[in-house]
From Swiss-Prot:
It is found in: Membrane. Magnesium transporter that may mediate the influx of magnesium. It is a multi-pass membrane protein. GO terms for molecular function: magnesium ion transmembrane transporter activity. InterPro entries: MRS2-like. The keyword S-adenosyl-L-methionine does not apply. Expressed in the whole plant except stems. The gene is MRS2-8. This is Magnesium transporter MRS2-8.
Length: 380
C-alpha cells in the first residue's frame, strides 16, 4: 500500500432490526408499533418464512396466506397481518397506503358498532361477519380499486398516444408508446398475480376455511381442546415441533368447524368471488388494451412494409436507368475517341449511331420495367 493512499471506509449493510407497524383493532383505534420482527412473530403466531414475504427490502409476489392465528397479506403496497382481533399493517412511505389506513379505521369501527360491541370472549355471532372477514374485505377492495384506478389512468394515456402514433410515426411518439407498454406489462403482471391468488383460494375449500380465524380461535378455547394441554408443549427439535403444530391445527379444525365448514366456506367464497370478478374486469380492460397495442403494431408494420416496398420500387427504377445510361455513355465515349475507323469519313453517321444507341437504351429500360411489373415487383 502506498504511504499517501487513503483508506475509504466501507459501510456495512445490516438487516433492519425493527419494523414500524400500525395496529388497528375492532374499534378502529390506531396504534403505531416499532418492534422487532420476533415480537410480531410471537404476537400473531406465524413463522419467519411467512413474515419474510412482508419484508420491504425483499421482492415477493402478491400472496394471501391463511395460517392458524393470522392471515398474511402481501398485496403490492398493502402488507398486513390480520388476526381475529386486530390488523397489523406495515408502515411505509407509500402515499397510496394513507387512504387504505383511513378506510380500515372507518370500516372496522363501523362494523364494530354494527355488532353492538357484543363479543363473548373470542366467539363471534353466527349471523355477523367476523372481524377478519371485514378486514380482508377492506384490503381486497383497496387493492382492487387501486389497480382499477391505475388501469383507467393508463387507458387515458395509452389510447390517445396510440392514435397519435398511427397518424404520425415519430421517434418521440414511439418512445412514449414504449414507456406506456412497459407500464402496461408491469400492471398486467400485478393484476394477474392477484387474480391467480384469489382463484387458487376459490378452488380449495380448505384454504378458504383457514381464513375463518374467529371460528378456530373459539374452537381452541373449547373444553375438547383444553383437555389436551399437553399438545401445547413443543420439543426442542424444530421438525418434531412443526409436526405437533400441524397435528394440533388439524385437531382444532376437526373439533370446531366440522359442522360449520359449509357456512364458513360460503361466506368466504362470496367475499372472494366479488373481488375476483372486480379484478377480472380490470384484467379484461388490460387485455383489450394489449390487443389494441398489438393491432397498432400490426398497422405500423404494414405501413413500414409499404414504405419499404416503395423504396425497393424506386431502387429498381434507378438501377434500370443507371444501366441504360451506362450503355449509352460507353457507346458515345467510344465514338468520341480520336481513333481512325471508316465511320468517321461518312457524313451523318455519328448522329445515326447516337440516336440508335439512345433508342436501344430506351427499349432496354422499358423491357426491364415490363419484366419487373410482370414479376409483380412493383405491387401492381
Amino acid at each position: 500500500m502506498l504511504p499517501n493512499e487513503e483508506l475509504v471506509p466501507v459501510k456495512r449493510i445490516t438487516p433492519q432490526s425493527s419494523w414500524s407497524w400500525i395496529s388497528i383493532d375492532a374499534t378502529g383505534k390506531k396504534t403505531v408499533l416499532d418492534v422487532d420482527k420476533y415480537v410480531i412473530m410471537h404476537r400473531v403466531q406465524i413463522h419467519a418464512r411467512d413474515l419474510r414475504i412482508l419484508d420491504p427490502n425483499l421482492f415477493y409476489p402478491s400472496a394471501i396466506l391463511g395460517r392458524e392465528r393470522a392471515i398474511v397479506l402481501n398485496l403490492e403496497h398493502i402488507k398486513a397481518i390480520i388476526t381475529a382481533k386486530e390488523v397489523l399493517i406495515q408502515d411505509s412511505s407509500d402515499e397510496n397506503l394513507i387512504p387504505t389506513l383511513e378506510e380500515f379505521q372507518t370500516r372496522l369501527s363501523v362494523g364494530n358498532k354494527a355488532h353492538g360491541g357484543q363479543l363473548d370472549g373470542d366467539v363471534v355471532e353466527e349471523d355477523e361477519s367476523a372481524f377478519e372477514f371485514r378486514a380482508l374485505e377492506v384490503a381486497l377492495e383497496a387493492i382492487c380499486s387501486f389497480l382499477a384506478a391505475r388501469t383507467i389512468e393508463l387507458e387515458k394515456s395509452a389510447y390517445p398516444a396510440l392514435d397519435e402514433l398511427t397518424l404520425k410515426l415519430t421517434s418521440r411518439n414511439l418512445l412514449r408508446v414504449c414507456k406506456l407498454k412497459s407500464s402496461m406489462t408491469r400492471l398486467t403482471a400485478q393484476v394477474q398475480k392477484i387474480k391467480d391468488e384469489l382463484e387458487q383460494l376459490l378452488e380449495d375449500d380448505e384454504d378458504m376455511a383457514e381464513l375463518y380465524l374467529s371460528r378456530k380461535l373459539a374452537g381452541a378455547s373449547s373444553p375438547a381442546i383444553d383437555s389436551g394441554e399437553h399438545i401445547n408443549w413443543y420439543p426442542t427439535s424444530p421438525t418434531i415441533g412443526a409436526k405437533i403444530s400441524r397435528a394440533k391445527s388439524h385437531l382444532v379444525r376437526s373439533a370446531t368447524v366440522r359442522g360449520d365448514d359449509k357456512n364458513d366456506v360460503e361466506e368466504v367464497e362470496m367475499l372472494l368471488e366479488a373481488h375476483f370478478m372486480q379484478i377480472d374486469r380490470t384484467l379484461n380492460k388490460l387485455t383489450e388494451l394489449r390487443e389494441y397495442v398489438d393491432e397498432t403494431e400490426d398497422f405500423l408494420n404494414i405501413q413500414l412494409d409499404s414504405s419499404r416496398n416503395q423504396l425497393i420500387k424506386f431502387e429498381i427504377i434507378l438501377t434500370a436507368g443507371s444501366i441504360c445510361v451506362s450503355v449509352y455513355s460507353v457507346v458515345v465515349g467510344i465514338l468520341g475517341m480520336n481513333i481512325p475507323f471508316p465511320w468517321n469519313i461518312k457524313k451523318h453517321m455519328f448522329k445515326w449511331v447516337v440516336s440508335g444507341t439512345a433508342t436501344v437504351c430506351a427499349i432496354l429500360f422499358v423491357t426491364i420495367m415490363s419484366f419487373a411489373r410482370y414479376k409483380k415487383l412493383f405491387g401492381f
